[in-house]
Curated annotation (Swiss-Prot):
Primary role: May be part of a signaling pathway that leads to NF-kappa-B activation.
Protein name as catalogued: Interleukin-1 receptor-associated kinase 1-binding protein 1 homolog
Gene3D superfamilies attached to this UniProt entry: Protein of unknown function (DUF541), domain 1, Protein of unknown function (DUF541), domain 2
Classification of source organism: Eukaryota, Metazoa, Chordata, Craniata, Vertebrata
Gene giving rise to this polypeptide: irak1bp1
Keyword Cell membrane tagged: no
Subcellular location: Cytoplasm; Nucleus
Highest taxon listed in the record's lineage: Eukaryota
Family (UniProt): Belongs to the IRAK1BP1 family.
Pfam families the record matches: SIMPL (PF04402)
Length: 245
């Protein structure tokens, strides 16, 4: 069986200054060849980058309920615990704007049931741990604290997408500079920059575990992004060594 020739991959190309010998159609059909609008020389390169962003927010919900023979008793029981939770959170450095309380009151046969849910948003995960540990220690089993739900704000995701794209552009520019330097030219301004692909995914390696540490939950919720761009740069004339003055 004949040996297969290795496939050559063109990652950058230079257009000659005088391209009249080649037809425009031939140039456009060749991978990596770019036809300059004004007959100038250009270099076209690809660039890629990959970054990750850990979640910047977490939400914990604290459920409180009480069933009593009278409505006043049920409301009073829940209200006392809500006041303690609010006081503990304030002392733990949580501001009012990050606390949301919802209440529901029901009559079941001869009893009254009062339920309340306190949802708390944390941007400091050390505060999250210390506040939750304190509430678990101080409150009885009638209070249920949900596992933290980690997520990304829109600003965090936009920053990740912007930075990974800029990283890909920077890598493409470095590649173009190296190509130009190799052939004795210098790199000019960017003519075209186009993002070809943007991918995002999460690390699901440990998501099936029933009980995870805070660090494992953060790792599982981390979002990864990869960007690939194509860029065309102007090529300047050959480099000349500066004369010593």
């Amino acid at each position: 069986m004949a040996a297969t020739s290795p496939v050559s991959r063109i990652f950058a190309s230079l257009q000659p200054a005088n391209s009249s010998a080649l037809h425009t159609g031939d140039l456009e059909n060749r991978a990596g060849i770019v036809v300059g609008q004004h007959g100038g020389r250009e270099v076209q390169v690809s660039g890629s980058a990959e970054l990750s962003a850990a979640p910047d927010r977490a939400q914990v919900c604290i459920a409180v309920s009480s069933s009593k023979g009278t409505a006043a008793e049920a409301k009073s029981s829940v209200q006392r615990r809500l006041e303690y939770i609010a006081q503990s959170l304030r002392q733990g450095g949580v501001t009012e704007e990050n606390i949301t309380v919802s209440k529901e009151f029901q009559r079941l046969s001869n009893t009254y049931k009062m339920e309340a849910v306190v949802c708390v948003v944390f941007s400091d995960f050390d505060k999250l741990q210390s506040n939750c540990n304190l509430l678990v220690e101080k409150l009885d089993s009638s209070v249920n604290i949900s596992p933290p739900h980690f997520y990304h704000t829109a600003d965090c995701l936009e920053k990740l997408r912007r930075e990974v794209c800029l990283g890909a552009v920077a890598n493409a520019r470095r590649k173009a500079q190296e190509v130009c330097r190799l052939v004795g030219h210098s790199l000019g301004k960017a003519l075209i920059i186009r993002e070809e692909e943007l991918r995002e995914w999460e690390d699901q390696a440990e998501s099936s575990q029933a009980h995870q540490s805070i660090q494992s939950k953060i790792k599982t919720a981390t979002i990864y992004a990869a960007s690939k761009i194509l860029a065309t740069f102007e090529i300047k004339g050959k480099e000349r060594h500066k004369k010593n003055r």
